[in-house]
Swiss-Prot record:
Pfam family, one: Aldo_ket_red
GO MF terms, alphabetically ordered: oxidoreductase activity
GO terms under biological process: potassium ion transmembrane transport
Homology family: Belongs to the shaker potassium channel beta subunit family.
Species assigned in the record: Schizosaccharomyces pombe (strain 972 / ATCC 24843)
Function: Probable accessory potassium channel protein which modulates the activity of the pore-forming alpha subunit.
SUPFAM superfamilies, alphabetized: NAD(P)-linked oxidoreductase (SSF51430)
Subcellular location: Cytoplasm; Nucleus
Name of the protein: Putative voltage-gated potassium channel subunit beta
PANTHER family for the chain: HYPERKINETIC, ISOFORM M (PTHR43150:SF2)
Superkingdom field: Eukaryota
Subunit structure: Forms heteromultimeric complexes with potassium channel alpha subunits.
Binding site for NADP(+): 33, 62, 67, 167, 193, 222-225, 233, 243, 301, 303, 307, 310-311
Organism placement in taxonomy: Eukaryota, Fungi, Dikarya, Ascomycota, Taphrinomycotina
GO cellular component: cytosol; monoatomic ion channel complex; nucleus
Length: 344
């Protein structure tokens, strides 16, 4: 049974501001998608994973109302309570949009009703009086943007969240939200949660770049290993029992297309670069995301504590990704970055 670690002690994981806000988040965070709350991932299992992350210097945790139909929030909330952490020492982000089970007319989307009732339900499942960041899990074109921004502003003013953000929103939608916030003296979002990895780059590096530069828009990026593809485990086929053979079967099919085969070849080549610097393919891919200073935190997914230990070692390779190595990776990917000084 995992023992309680009451006080947070930062280790080697660096901290970054969430965009231009004053909130500091660990460069790696731990997410509950596909794991905690699902079958086989009960409170005890979740607690062991959260404690391992905490002991390594991670204090930021991500979930959503839709994850395991709300059970992810329930299990993670119970695990945190049993670990006895001081509320001021960790950061929780959750998301509303998809609902947490039954899809009734007002239990999904971004109406003011669902945004407020959805977070209230999330807080009840988490067993917390507030979250640090509440995010709109997807845009909702059926709801006026003013209603959306006013609802999130109300949650913050009511003390149920400190900040709000977006997830997989377009640059135009984020800009629209900022415009509404400025026009009506409301609270603007501070960060987006986009998919970002070395095979999925255009939206984050090009579409969102102006928002990062103008507003200092932050990012809590997900799928840094692209559902495991960047780990190298699929370089020689799809192992039986792996997520691509069970959960992401459509993605497995995509790997059989000419484009998919090209991507696997690119992963093989980049895996050789990882070997040259002493990293695993996963560690290189994770370190690569953190070379981008516009990334506030990279969300890790882990089904067991040992995976967290190995993935967090990626911080040791951030500085080893020199401009020459980054250029070589871009050449392998046949990707031309914008001419900006965004890497450090």
């Amino acid at each position: 049974m995992a023992s309680a670690t009451t006080h947070f002690q930062p280790k080697n994981v660096p901290f970054r501001f969430l965009g231009r806000s004053g909130l500091k988040v660990s460069a790696f965070s731990l997410g509950g998608w596909l794991t905690y709350g699902n079958e086989g991932y009960d409170v005890e299992h979740t607690k062991n994973c959260l404690k391992q992350a905490w002991d390594l210097g991670i204090n930021t945790f991500d979930t959503a109302e839709i994850y395991s139909n709300g059970n992810s929030e329930t299990v993670m909330g119970k695990a945190i309570k049993e670990l006895g952490w001081d509320r001021s020492e960790y950061v929780i982000t959750t998301k509303v949009f998809f609902g947490a089970g039954t899809k009734l007319p007002n239990t999904t989307g971004l109406s003011r009703k669902h945004i407020i009732e959805g977070l209230n339900a999330s807080l009840k499942r988490l067993g917390l009086p507030y979250v640090d960041v509440i995010m709109a899990h997807r845009p909702d074109p059926s709801v006026p943007m003013e209603e959306v921004v006013r609802a999130f502003t109300q949650l913050i003013q009511d003390g149920k969240a400190f900040y709000w953000g977006t997830s997989e929103w377009s640059a135009f939608e984020i800009e629209h939200a900022h415009h509404i916030a400025t026009k009506y003296n409301l609270i603007a979002p501070v960060a987006d949660q986009p998919q970002y990895n070395y095979l999925t780059r255009d939206h984050f590096e090009k579409d969102l770049l102006p928002l990062q530069q103008i507003y200092g828009y932050g990012a809590t990026v997900w799928s840094p290993l692209k559902s495991g593809i960047l780990t190298g485990k699929y370089n020689d086929g799809i192992p039986e029992g792996s997520r691509l053979s069970t959960t992401f079967t459509s993605l497995a099919g995509q790997l059989q297309t000419p484009e998919g085969k090209t991507q696997l070849d690119q992963v093989r080549q980049i895996s050789k670069i990882a070997e040259q610097i002493g990293a695993t393919p996963s560690q290189l891919a994770l370190a690569w995301t953190l070379k981008n200073p516009y990334v506030s935190t990279t969300i890790l997914g882990a089904s067991k504590p040992e995976q967290i230990v190995e993935n967090v070692k990626a911080v040791e390779f951030i500085d080893k990704l020199t401009p020459e190595i980054l250029k070589k990776i871009d050449e392998i990917l046949n990707f031309t970055p914008l001419e900006i000084q965004y890497r450090r």
